[in-house]
Amino acid sequence: MPIKIPDQLPAAEVLGQENIFVMTESRAVTQNIRPLRVLILNLMPKKIETEIQLMRMLSNSPLQVDVDLLRIDDRESKNTPQAHLENFYHDFEQVRGNNYDGMIITGAPLGLVEFEEVVYWPRIVEIIEWSHQHVTSTLFLCWAVQAALKALYGMEKQTHGEKLSGVYRHHRLDEHEPLLRGFDDEFVAPHSRYAAFDGDLIRAHTDLQIFAESAEAGVYLAATKDCRQVFVTGHPEYDALTLDGEYQRDLAAGLEPVIPVNYYPDNDPTRTPRASWRSHGHLLFSNWLNYYVYQLTSYRVEDIGKVFTYQQNSPSR
């Protein structure tokens, strides 16, 4: 089934050229089924690039998905046309009263910035709290995992001495976890972060279930027991050339970045990298949509908040 997006969104043309099943709003109104409503809080600088990457992941599912885009920083963007933001993005006040089957909060280039110094940190905390009553399941990516661990569990950020960048091997820890259904026992995924996610610390300070880990990159995939918060510390949505773009950008800025590990053929940045994580990336998003969103959400989207209020107030809990 397709992902439903606005008719003029740039991602529609790009994904169509890639033979990915998308449905414009004008066509979707003829469909007589309820699509899943997913809110994407896009914190990445290159918003159009991130939109395309995430919508590519969401489209590979038998479920129809209706996407809303959210921004919380109203400062002028250096990487995204203002007209694009005005045409396709909502601010939080516009969606505050809505319910969503799923929400994705992206990463952000803020790994070395203290939370309190992030201009929109109070709003991030507010949205995470808001999601408890308005979203069935939230997927946090990379920096958003750090933010959620702080907001939900009071965990302070841990950082690496140098940026963790490259494609790392992970092993699954649970053979029966639906999020990993169809995964190989070992799989690779890209990372691009200063954040450190130590399994022992996360186990000591949270009640999260850890489903996949890496000897080099730490925890990769975890979730709350009720499936309502999912934490992915890497970037399974990345294109084959995204890490290369980041490396070349940092190189041009004189930052002397480390070469992303296990990424370039023969570790040679002049050679074109290929994506080795694409199938598992698609599978992760598909499993999340199916098992953590579709299977758990309310039949009527307007009932989502009522269901979770009832569950929280139930004497059996």
From Swiss-Prot:
GO terms for biological process: L-methionine biosynthetic process from homoserine via O-succinyl-L-homoserine and cystathionine. Pathway: Amino-acid biosynthesis; L-methionine biosynthesis via de novo pathway; O-succinyl-L-homoserine from L-homoserine: step 1/1. The keyword Membrane does not apply. It catalyses: L-homoserine + succinyl-CoA = O-succinyl-L-homoserine + CoA. One of its GO terms (molecular function) is homoserine O-acetyltransferase activity. The record marks S192 as: Important for substrate specificity. The active site is at C142 (acyl-thioester intermediate), H235 (proton acceptor), E237. Keywords: Acyltransferase, Amino-acid biosynthesis, Cytoplasm, Methionine biosynthesis, Transferase. Transmembrane segments: none annotated. Substrate binds at K163, S192, R249. It comes from the Bacteria. It is found in: Cytoplasm. The keyword Transferase applies. The record marks G111 as: Important for acyl-CoA specificity. Its EC number is 2.3.1.46. Belongs to the MetA family. Transfers a succinyl group from succinyl-CoA to L-homoserine, forming succinyl-L-homoserine. This is Homoserine O-succinyltransferase. The lineage of its organism: Bacteria, Pseudomonadati, Pseudomonadota, Gammaproteobacteria, Aeromonadales.
